[in-house]
């Protein structure tokens, strides 16, 4: 049928008055190249007749061509220009050049040059980064991969931020994922990733979740039939610095992928295990003022992490016809992350009244705090795609997830130095199973050769129940008893209906799109304590529009500019709405706000990209973000020695910044990528009937520099830096990490060995260390310096035992990972 339509199209095209040339441009991995430049020249004179850029499907067309002999060139940033010669036009003919494949790098006749892909590819709505460029993340997780991107930072607590915002959404192969970002980023092996797309101003066909935009993780795939198998091993050397930790920390892992592909079937099987412990310590001080009494308790001790992940993945894809595709996938896994804080509180004292010399000394004590977070899950998805006769595409997808979240927290205050003395023993659980359903139907068709329209409907259902039991005792020989005021049942039900339309078109060097998404959300939060004093249901419902628009203009082969707008939402998690306190550790209770509103965001950005000599490139993006109902974690005084950490809507914020990146090729062997972000953050609002006002300039820098000794050996240095940052109630200090990676391949690139030196310090720097301070005048002051393990040595081995092309596609969690 498609062949018949193509013949009919050619027939009617011939009836036109003038001749045409049509074709399609893709890369060597069969990815269609949007915005590739195609130029038409007269054969004899080499005069340029005209130029066009490809549309979203890589198609191009030249109209009204006079009779004569011509040739064309097709080019795209980071790829070798390709020339098609001896194109003869006569008698109002249509010439179909078919698929033009561009290869990376540059090759000269009889000269061998090691070609490298550009680190970044800019498109109208996204930046694309190739994972192979970031060797320091080899054998690790996706989290270590994305920290190399401009404007992406990870602080000492493992929190990921994009352009200064911790709110963003994750896509896997274009499929949205709702869940704790740290979980998805820790679970997926970096070896399975082909590239990462940074979508800062998403269109209406994407979910509006995530105030900083979307990060789309694309797993490796290929187009060659056959079998592909790869296994990766990872092992860590013993820790150089012990930090006084009670036991040794282990780091090891393995992951594998096996893929079989033929004309109709694509079957993938994968699994991984990763143990990723981290040693460290913390030094802190807390002071409070309550009832004219000043209390002070400094502390010091171990803060370490034991983390282990297991998962297995299976996907089967069936294409009975070229226009029909059906896929079914399953994903199951277990995750456990234990945070141990064994802290000595020493030199504790109080002064009463405040400002006097009446100082009373407290006893010193030892706090053993073990907080474990578990996440056992299983999910499945079904996808169906059908291409109609008019080349329009109908897609249907269904995803269901069950996740059991939980893990106890143990908090013991013991004697010091005699730890056999028990002052208080607390044990609280937070088992909270989650059920998620997502279904989507969308339809895409071409209005004409250069115009496309997308329409769709989506339904999401979340049922998240929690049973939180808080127990206490004062003697090891006594049983625990229930603390009813801290024990509760919390149930969140959320239903979302969404409709969207997206219009995109292209004319000559100008491309633009506009879209609108309408969303109706219903949220029910059921709260019940075990003291039988609270039993209520809180509702929050709304219907809202999310418009988006983008425009890009290609000035010439080297320069393009773009402008984009997007309206977003950052939804609140169940954890942040749970109003019942949870004992995080001896000096902190943590609780949420049941009336917490989502954040609503308007973002606009202007981008510029310039191709320079020697394949060097420069890009820059100026952005502005306005956020309503900003959610911050703020502190109040609970009692003389405990602070209450609360999540609350504290006001509105404005962020204006600029993001800059550059591909720098110093020589054929030395290539660097540098990216930076600087922005001004202004927050105005109030909390607890007190005004909040903070304004600061924050910047970050990511550097990646690679030197190739030979075609099969290279050395890479990376450096990630985050400046001081003003918060709603204090300041986070600077945070940085340098890394060095040596890589060597053998056996015709089938065996790859990587030696990594992570968090370089040598006792000379303050790598992997950050101080976090919060205060409220005349009420409290707290500062904690987190010092984590440095000079970590890792060895990775990767072996391809079936040398076909990897076409694996796996699914990921949609709901549970946001709550982990």
Feature roles, as predicted:
Residues 37-41, 75-77, 94-135, 155-157, ...:
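Short, acidic, small-residue-rich periplasmic hinge/interaction motif at the N-terminus
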Residues 436-438, 481-487, 591-593, 597, ...:
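Outer membrane beta-barrel strand-and-loop segments of large Gram-negative receptors
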Residues 143-177, 206, 213:
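Extracytoplasmic beta-strand/coil segments of soluble accessory domains associated
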Residues 94-100, 142-145, 183-184, 198, ...:
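N-terminal periplasmic accessory domains that precede
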Residues 43-59:
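Short, acidic Ser/Thr/Gly-rich low-complexity loop/linker segments typical of extracellular
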Residues 142, 148, 175-205:
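Short acidic/polar hinge/loop motifs at secondary-structure boundaries
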């Amino acid at each position: 049928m498609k062949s018949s339509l193509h013949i009919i199209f050619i027939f009617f095209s011939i009836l036109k008055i003038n001749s045409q040339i049509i074709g399609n441009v893709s890369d060597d991995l069969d990815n269609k190249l949007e915005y590739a430049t195609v130029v038409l020249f007269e054969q004899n004179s080499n005069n340029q007749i005209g130029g066009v850029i490809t549309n979203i499907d890589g198609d191009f067309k030249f109209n009204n061509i006079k009779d004569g002999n011509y040739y064309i060139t097709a080019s795209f940033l980071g790829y070798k220009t390709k020339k098609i010669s001896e194109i003869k036009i006569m008698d109002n003919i249509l010439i179909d050049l078919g698929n033009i494949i561009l290869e990376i790098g540059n090759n000269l006749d009889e000269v061998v040059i090691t070609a490298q892909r550009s680190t970044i590819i800019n498109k109208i709505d996204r930046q694309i980064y190739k994972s192979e460029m970031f060797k320091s993340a080899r054998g690790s997780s996706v989290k270590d991969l994305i920290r190399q991107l401009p404007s992406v930072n990870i602080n000492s607590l493992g929190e990921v931020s994009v352009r200064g915002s911790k709110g963003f959404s994750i896509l896997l192969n274009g499929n949205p994922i709702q869940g704790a970002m740290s979980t998805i980023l820790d679970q997926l092996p970096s070896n399975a990733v082909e590239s990462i797309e940074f979508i800062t101003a998403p269109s209406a066909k994407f979910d509006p979740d995530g105030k900083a935009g979307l990060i789309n993780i694309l797993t490796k795939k290929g187009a060659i039939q056959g079998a592909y198998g790869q296994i990766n091993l990872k092992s860590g050397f013993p820790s150089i610095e012990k930090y006084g930790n009670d036991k040794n920390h282990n780091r090891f892992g393995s992951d594998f992928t096996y893929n079989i592909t033929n004309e109709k079937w694509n079957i993938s099987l994968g699994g991984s295990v990763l143990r990723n412990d981290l040693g460290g310590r913390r030094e802190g001080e807390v002071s409070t003022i309550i009832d004219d009494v000043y209390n002070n308790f400094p502390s010091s001790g171990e803060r370490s992490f034991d983390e282990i992940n297991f998962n297995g993945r299976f996907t089967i894809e069936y294409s009975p016809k070229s226009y029909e595709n059906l896929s079914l996938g399953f994903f199951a896994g277990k995750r456990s992350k234990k945070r141990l804080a064994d802290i000595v509180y020493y030199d504790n004292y109080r002064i009463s009244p405040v400002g006097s010399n009446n100082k009373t000394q407290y006893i010193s004590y030892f706090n053993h705090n073990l907080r474990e977070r578990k996440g056992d899950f299983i999910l499945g998805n079904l996808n169906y795609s059908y291409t109609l006769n008019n080349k329009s595409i109908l897609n249907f997808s269904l995803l269901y997830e069950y996740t059991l979240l939980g893990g106890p927290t143990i908090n013991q205050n013991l004697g010091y130095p005699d730890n056999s003395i028990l002052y208080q023993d607390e044990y609280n659980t937070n088992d909270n199973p989650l059920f998620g359903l997502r279904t989507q139907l969308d339809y895409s068709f071409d209005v004409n050769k250069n115009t496309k329209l997308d329409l769709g409907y989506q339904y999401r259902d979340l049922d998240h129940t929690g049973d939180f039991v808080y127990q206490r005792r004062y003697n090891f020989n006594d049983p625990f008893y229930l603390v009813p005021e801290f024990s509760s049942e919390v149930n969140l039900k959320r239903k979302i209906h969404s409709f969207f339309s997206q219009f995109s078109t292209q004319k000559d060097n100008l491309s633009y799109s506009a879209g609108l998404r309408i969303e109706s959300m219903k949220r029910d939060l059921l709260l019940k304590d075990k003291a039988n004093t609270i039993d209520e249901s809180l509702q929050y419902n709304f219907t809202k529009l999310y418009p988006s628009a983008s425009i890009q203009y290609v000035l010439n082969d080297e320069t393009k500019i773009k402008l984009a707008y997007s309206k977003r939402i950052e939804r609140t998690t169940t954890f942040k709405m749970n109003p019942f306190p949870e004992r995080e550790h001896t000096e902190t209770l943590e609780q949420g706000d049941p009336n917490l509103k989502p954040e609503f965001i308007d973002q606009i950005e202007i981008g510029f990209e310039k191709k320079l000599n020697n394949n060097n490139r420069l890009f820059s993006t100026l952005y502005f973000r306005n956020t309503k109902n900003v959610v911050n974690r703020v502190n109040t005084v609970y009692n003389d020695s405990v602070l209450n950490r609360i999540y609350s809507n504290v006001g509105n914020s404005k962020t204006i910044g600029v993001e800059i990146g550059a591909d720098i090729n110093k020589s054929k062997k030395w290539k660097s990528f540098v990216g930076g972000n600087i922005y001004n953050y202004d927050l105005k609002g109030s909390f607890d009937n007190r005004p909040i006002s903070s304004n600061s300039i924050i910047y970050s820098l990511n550097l990646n520099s690679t030197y190739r000794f030979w075609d099969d050996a290279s050395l890479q240095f990376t450096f990630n830096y985050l400046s001081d940052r003003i918060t709603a109630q204090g300041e986070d200090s600077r945070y940085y990490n340098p890394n060095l990676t040596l890589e060597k391949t053998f056996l015709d690139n089938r065996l790859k060995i990587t030696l990594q030196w992570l968090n370089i310090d040598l006792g000379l720097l303050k790598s992997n260390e950050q101080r976090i301070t919060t205060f409220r005048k005349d009420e409290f002051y707290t500062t904690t310096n987190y010092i984590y393990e440095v000079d970590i040595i890792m060895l990775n081995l990767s072996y391809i035992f079936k040398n076909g092309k990897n076409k694996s596609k796996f699914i990921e969690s949609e709901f549970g990972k946001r709550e982990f």
